[in-house]
Amino acid sequence: MLKTISPLISPELLKVLAEMGHGDEIIFSDAHFPAHSMGPQVIRADGLRVSDLLQAIIPLFELDSYAPPLVMMAAVEGDALDPTVEQCYRQALSAQAPCPDIVRIDRFAFYDRAQKAFAIVITGERAKYGNILLKKGVTP
């Protein structure tokens, strides 16, 4: 254990967060996301909710200030989003500073970004459209 680092952050996740450079992206996915077929490094965080992990990492993680740092998947036509999912994520991310806007992109564009991500963290999140991409910024 380390002081001031949440016990929700595994050693593997801490290492990945430290190795990421500015502009690198990481996905925190729901339990249904096809992470293992996407290609990048996959970290398991079974049983944890995305919002809890976001709240744990945000004190350690600088969001990009030059490009939209938060991206979520848009609902497929005919499907509906649960607005409480985004609200919960925004609340978790605003623990350190005001939360930037979250951009929504279509499912296949999100999958393309996921294939190029530095890592994907699979959580136990069950919320539909519960995946979020974070783009790392420059630490001041």
UniProtKB/Swiss-Prot annotation:
- This chain belongs to the protein called L-fucose mutarotase
Please name the HAMAP family in this protein's record: L_fucose_rotase
What does the record note on quaternary structure?
Homodecamer.
Reaction catalysed by this chain?
alpha-L-fucose = beta-L-fucose
Q: Molecular function terms in GO for this entry?
A: fucose binding; L-fucose mutarotase activity
Q: Which UniProt keywords apply?
A: Carbohydrate metabolism, Cytoplasm, Fucose metabolism, Isomerase
Give the matching Pfam families.
RbsD_FucU (PF05025)
